[in-house]
Design a protein with these regions (language model features):
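Basic, flexible Lys/Arg- and Gly-enriched helix-loop patches that mediate nucleic-acid binding at interfaces
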Residues: 2-260
């Protein structure tokens, strides 16, 4: 139970809610003596009020920000990274007035739905493949997609020294089909198709869990609706969130696996 006194929360949750790091990483930093509450060194399990001065690795933690969760229709050619050294990074492309990060990735030549947020819990819970959250894609290949090919995709394909999970595959055209995955491996869909000598010529993500791209124009973004956010939080309620560290220096290394 997070709240033991009215208005107070555990310090690891405070740091996670502020977008500083995951709760597990917060506990590590607290144990290492890198978190202070005012002038006092914090201890694991300490309770804090939102207006208390909290210092993380010597820096004052800003007051909790209003949660931001954006639905973005990423164009081809944009890279899902927060690193400024990448000239086509999605943060500069979007030019949003507040600090946000992409949740997962789509490779540079793919397009469609990417979520962006300032909340560490969203990143951690959606990213963790063990939570088996659904992601839906529209795929077009370079030649006629045979029925046997589509069935084989659905049953699982050996790539990257493992067998992909079974997934849903539905034909929508002679060369196009819909795929619903519950995992995210590096260039997963492209590798799965290449295994059967099919080349992906178009890949578009249209859904993450209950969030749909809909008719959002390419390159545009919108905030999730209150109804979408409520349902998303319900779906994430029992999800683990302690495997991905949420910080700008490590985010590209941590999010590699979601590149379809």
């Amino acid at each position: 139970m997070e709240e033991k006194e009215e208005g107070k929360i555990r310090i690891n949750k405070y740091l996670s809610d502020a977008g500083v790091c995951s709760r597990r990483e917060a506990d590590r930093q607290i144990a290492a003596g890198n978190v202070r509450i005012g002038d006092a060194v914090a201890r694991i399990g300490d309770l804090v009020m939102p207006d208390m001065p909290i210092y993380y690795q010597g820096r004052l933690v800003e007051a909790e920000e209003e949660p931001i969760l954006l639905v973005v229709n990423k164009p081809k050619g944009i890279v899902c990274t927060a690193q400024k050294k990448e000239k086509d990074n999605i943060v500069d492309f979007l030019h949003y007035p507040k600090r946000i990060y992409p949740i997962g990735r789509l490779d540079k030549q793919s397009e469609g739905l990417i979520l962006m947020t300032n909340k560490g819990d969203f990143v951690n819970k959606i990213m963790r493949s063990g939570n088996r959250h659904e992601k839906e894609y529209l795929v077009t290949v370079h030649k006629t997609a045979s029925d046997s090919f589509l069935r084989a995709l659905a049953e699982g394909v050996p790539i990257l020294d493992t067998m992909t999970r079974k997934c849903r595959v539905e034909r929508i055209g002679k060369r196009s089909f819909r795929m619903v995955l519950t995992q995210g491996m590096n260039r997963q869909i492209r590798r799965m198709c290449e295994y059967f000598d099919y080349r992906v010529v178009s890949l578009k993500r249209v859904r993450i869990m209950n969030i749909r791209l809909g008719d959002l124009p390419t390159g545009a973004y919108r905030k999730v609706t209150p109804e979408e956010l409520k349902r998303l939080e319900q779906l994430l309620e029992n999800s683990s969130n302690d495997t991905v560290r949420f910080d700008s220096s490590a985010i590209d290394q941590q999010l590699w696996e979601e590149e379809e």
